[in-house]
């Protein structure tokens, strides 16, 4: 019943931050069968278009989550193919918290199954399943000995770490990243490695004591009690504890009669009156589950935000912020800008001079890091008073795909720098940025983070990336946003929402056109750099795939 891993953070599936439990089903079997049929039909060559004499440009990928099914199911897992829309307003703050559903009920009543059915029926991305089983307190040596003999009461409110539960749920509702313990029921202890959860639009919290704490109740937007016959619950508990938790039948029955049943009568069943919805028969009650799903959908519609339009209409005619630093426009810098802005420039020259500018930009950005006095001894035995970096560590985070091109320049000047990536794409139907994927190094909250994107026009993607870093507890004044070219609109948007973020670029252009493209601009940087510049719609910057 432990919650499935979310992070992003973890091993980078292209949509790893979209958390969902394993949902086997008929559709999953059909998808897997179809995949097997295609793989058996022939070699990879049969799946590729014929190669002609001319070079065929690759197509950029954009999100269309409102016109395509947002799910890809296999027999083992559910992957959300739609990105996460903005969860903050144009001020960079979260205007509405994630929707939290509490699932209570007796042990083995089917809470986890009901939760998974709700997730499957919702068909929306970014759902987090949080299990109360992960929050059992760490047992003392004496308590572990009692638990090994089935003499410890795990069905009492005192067995749970409610302080950790409440703080974790609060952070999730605020959109922040959290670390969740993994409880080992075989050894009755927490495992060393905790799992990361992040990016919840909907939180489903389930557990036997889900309604046992007043503060916890106030965090739940919807409370559901799963009511199942006691005999069925006993059979399920026997099967689960014997097969999954290494117990014997005598020990399970002893524990049930001594602790589980009395705890249900004393602590759990009375909380049924606190529930908004009571689901008899658990997962077999499809009518109740459909009603729950309809209500959650209506709540999500009320939480939809439109950020990009608000950015376009704000901050007109304001002076450039003091947090902006533009690389000195020397003849050399202007000469390189002339080359990369020229539409006739070959791809090789575009890459060469872009890399030169990136190197200069990174070197310029490093001068804003904190330094302190230090003394070293020269080979001549003399003291030299100089400077050394006063921070803990430098981490680079690139906004895919164009921002990835700046990573080599950062690695060239920062030894052993850690690198993370964030993928943000535009939904063509809504025009809003959507978070599809992130992979961030562990423990970045004390690092100075260099956030890299080659062009910033409206600032929508940059704002989303900064918001992700803040959700992972990176201080705002330790974030440096680097870009080769920015529009004034993007500079104002980021600076207004995050006034302590340092913005560093090689040039700032005045205008953004009606299609939110920088004028005069540089063209679509990613297409020109990666050789995918023949785009039918005539896009002239990376916004067609990634919101700048």
UniProtKB/Swiss-Prot annotation:
Key words, A-Z = ATP-binding, Cytoplasm, Kinase, Nucleotide-binding, Nucleus, Phosphoprotein, Transferase, Ubl conjugation
Q: Which pathway does the database say it acts in?
A: Pyrimidine metabolism; UMP biosynthesis via salvage pathway; UMP from uridine: step 1/1
Q: Name one GO molecular function term.
A: ATP binding
Key word Kinase present: yes
Q: Where is the composition biased (Low complexity)?
A: 1-18
**Post-translational modification Phosphoserine, affected residues:** 56, 63, 539
GO biological processes: UMP salvage
Catalytic activity reads: uridine + ATP = UMP + ADP + H(+); cytidine + ATP = CMP + ADP + H(+)
Which segment of the chain is annotated as a signal peptide? none
Major location category of this protein = cytoplasm
The record's InterPro entries line, in alphabetical order, gives: P-loop_NTPase, PRibTrfase_dom, PRK/URK, PRTase-like, Uridine_kinase-like
Chain residues that bind ATP: 105-112
Record localization? Cytoplasm; Nucleus
The ranges of region (Disordered) come to 1-74
Query: What are its E.C. numbers?
Result: 2.7.1.48
Q: Which Gene3D superfamilies match?
A: 3.40.50.2020, P-loop containing nucleotide triphosphate hydrolases
Q: Does the keyword Lipoprotein apply?
A: no
Q: Which GO terms describe its cellular component?
A: cytoplasm; nucleus
**Main role?**
May contribute to UTP accumulation needed for blast transformation and proliferation.
Membership in a protein family = Belongs to the uridine kinase family.
Q: How does it assemble?
A: Interacts with RNF19B.
Q: What name appears for this protein in its UniProt entry?
A: Uridine-cytidine kinase-like 1
Which organism was this protein described from? Answer: Mus musculus (Mouse)
């Amino acid at each position: 019943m432990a919650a499935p891993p979310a992070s992003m953070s973890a091993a980078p599936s292209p949509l790893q931050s979209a958390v969902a439990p394993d949902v086997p089903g008929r559709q999953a079997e059909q998808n897997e069968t179809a995949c097997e049929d295609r793989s058996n039909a022939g070699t990879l060559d049969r799946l590729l278009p014929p190669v002609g004499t001319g070079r065929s440009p690759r197509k950029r990928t954009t999100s269309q989550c409102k016109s395509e099914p947002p799910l890809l199911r296999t027999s083992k897992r559910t992957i959300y193919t739609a990105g996460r829309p903005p969860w903050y307003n144009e001020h960079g703050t979260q205007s509405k918290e994630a929707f939290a559903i509490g699932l209570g009920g007796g042990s083995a009543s089917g809470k986890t199954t009901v939760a998974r059915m709700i997730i499957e029926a919702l068909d929306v991305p970014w759902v987090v399943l949080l299990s109360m089983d992960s929050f059992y307190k760490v047992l003392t040596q004496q308590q572990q000995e009692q638990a090994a003999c089935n003499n410890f009461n795990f069905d009492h409110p005192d067995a749970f770490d409610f302080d950790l539960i409440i703080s974790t749920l609060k952070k999730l509702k605020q959109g922040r990243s959290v670390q969740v313990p993994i409880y080992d029921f075989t050894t009755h202890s927490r495992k060393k490695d905790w799992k990361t959860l992040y990016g919840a639009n909907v939180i489903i919290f389930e557990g036997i004591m889900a309604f046992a704490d007043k503060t916890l109740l106030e965090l739940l937007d919807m409370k559901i009690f799963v009511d199942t016959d006691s005999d069925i619950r006993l059979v399920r508990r026997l099967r689960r504890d014997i097969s999954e938790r290494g117990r014997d039948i005598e020990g399970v029955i002893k524990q049930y009669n001594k602790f589980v049943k009395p705890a249900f009568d004393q602590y759990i069943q009375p909380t049924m009156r606190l529930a908004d919805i009571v689901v008899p028969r658990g997962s077999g009650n499809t009518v109740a589950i459909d009603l729950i799903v309809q209500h959650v959908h209506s709540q999500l519609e009320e939480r939809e935000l439109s950020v990009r339009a608000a950015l376009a209409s704000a901050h007109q005619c304001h002076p450039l912020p003091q947090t902006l630093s533009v690389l000195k426009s020397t003849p050399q810098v202007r000469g390189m800008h002339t080359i990369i802005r020229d539409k006739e420039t070959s791809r090789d020259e575009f890459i060469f001079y872009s890399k030169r500018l990136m190197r200069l930009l990174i070197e310029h950005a490093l001068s804003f890091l904190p330094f302190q006095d230090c003394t070293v001894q020269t080979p001549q035995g003399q003291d030299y008073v100089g400077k050394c970096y006063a921070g803990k560590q430098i981490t680079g985070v690139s906004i895919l795909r164009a921002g990835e091109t700046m990573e080599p320049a950062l690695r060239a000047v920062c030894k052993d720098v850690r690198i993370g990536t964030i993928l943000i794409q535009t939904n063509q139907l809504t025009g809003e940025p959507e978070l599809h994927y992130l992979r961030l190094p562990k423990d970045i909250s004390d690092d100075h983070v260099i956030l890299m994107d080659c062009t910033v026009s409206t600032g929508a993607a940059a704002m989303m990336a900064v918001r992700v870093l803040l959700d992972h507890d990176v201080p705002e004044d330790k974030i440096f946003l680097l870009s080769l070219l920015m529009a004034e609109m993007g500079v104002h948007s980021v600076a207004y929402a995050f006034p302590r973020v340092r913005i560093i670029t090689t040039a700032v252009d005045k205008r953004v056109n009606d299609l939110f493209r920088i004028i005069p601009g540089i063209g679509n940087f990613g297409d020109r750099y990666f050789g995918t510049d023949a785009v039918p719609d005539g896009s002239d910057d990376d916004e067609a795939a990634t919101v700048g």
